[in-house]
């Protein structure tokens, strides 16, 4: 006998509240980032309860992939979530004239791009950067930025679109912060987290994009993730 429980609000709310606290307060403990052979899942989920012949109840949790999206990249081509199915993807949110954390985050992403190319060239890795200031980050501007940091555009897309669509994707899809702010550097308050997605576009980890140690953990976790069937 099976029962499917959709939108279990109490469990989901507790999970999301804990995650948001970690993200908003920046209380990531690198020691706690060590992983076993199986990485955790994050985000919304369904629980299916199964009752066996012996009356034993079992719960099977299914996590949702990130939401659908469609944005223009640095070459004015439409990119959707389907372009990342089957790949392990590193995702960040940035803007090209960001005066604070973005240059550091982009440099860390570029460093891992090179590290993967040299040490694991056959790994199905992709990189994805969403502009949180898309009203000024045109495809041409994104292309110049990507070239400036040495991005391999065969594996790394920089996306722009309607501001609210990107804010909603960050906040509702990735559970991360992104919104205009008069008090934030560059006029946008946004997360410093880099998200690790598995081949099914499910969120499997959050990392401090300004920390070499945290990004090295991401590198290790991506390799672990590549071994999942």
Predicted ranges, named:
Residues 2-68, 229:
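N-terminal targeting signals for export/organelle localization
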Residues 66-67, 89, 191-193:
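Short loop/turn microsegments at loop-to-beta-strand junctions
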Residues 79-109, 128:
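Short active-site neighborhood of thiol/selenol oxidoreductases, capturing the structured segment around
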Residues 117-122, 150-152:
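Short helix-capping segments at alpha-helix termini
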Residues 122-137, 154-166:
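Thiol-based oxidoreductase modules, predominantly thioredoxin-like and allied folds used
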Residues 143-191:
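Short, internal strand/loop/helix patches
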Residues 180-229:
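Thiol-/selenol-based redox modules, centered on thioredoxin-like
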């Amino acid at each position: 006998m099976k029962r499917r429980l959709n939108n279990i609000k109490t469990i989901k709310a507790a999970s999301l509240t804990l995650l948001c606290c970690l993200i908003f307060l920046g209380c990531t403990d690198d020691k706690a980032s060590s992983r076993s052979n199986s990485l955790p899942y994050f985000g919304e989920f369904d629980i299916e309860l199964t009752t066996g012949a012996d009356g034993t109840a079992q719960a099977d949790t299914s996590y949702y992939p990130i939401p659908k999206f469609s944005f223009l990249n640095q070459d004015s081509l439409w990119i959707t979530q389907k372009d990342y199915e089957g790949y392990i993807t590193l995702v960040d949110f940035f803007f090209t004239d960001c005066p604070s954390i973005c240059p550091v985050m982009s440099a860390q992403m570029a460093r891992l791009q090179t590290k993967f190319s040299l040490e694991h060239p056959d790994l199905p890795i992709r990189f994805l950067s969403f502009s949180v200031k898309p009203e000024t980050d045109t495809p041409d501007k994104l292309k110049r930025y990507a070239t400036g940091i040495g991005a391999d555009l065969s594996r790394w897309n920089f996306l722009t679109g309607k501001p609210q669509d990107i804010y909603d994707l960050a906040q509702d899809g990735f559970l991360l912060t992104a919104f205009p702010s008069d008090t934030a550097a560059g006029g946008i308050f946004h997360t410093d987290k880099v998200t690790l997605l598995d081949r099914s576009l499910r969120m499997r980890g959050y990392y401090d994009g300004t920390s070499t140690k945290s990004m090295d953990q991401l590198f290790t976790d991506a390799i672990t993730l590549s071994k999942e069937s």
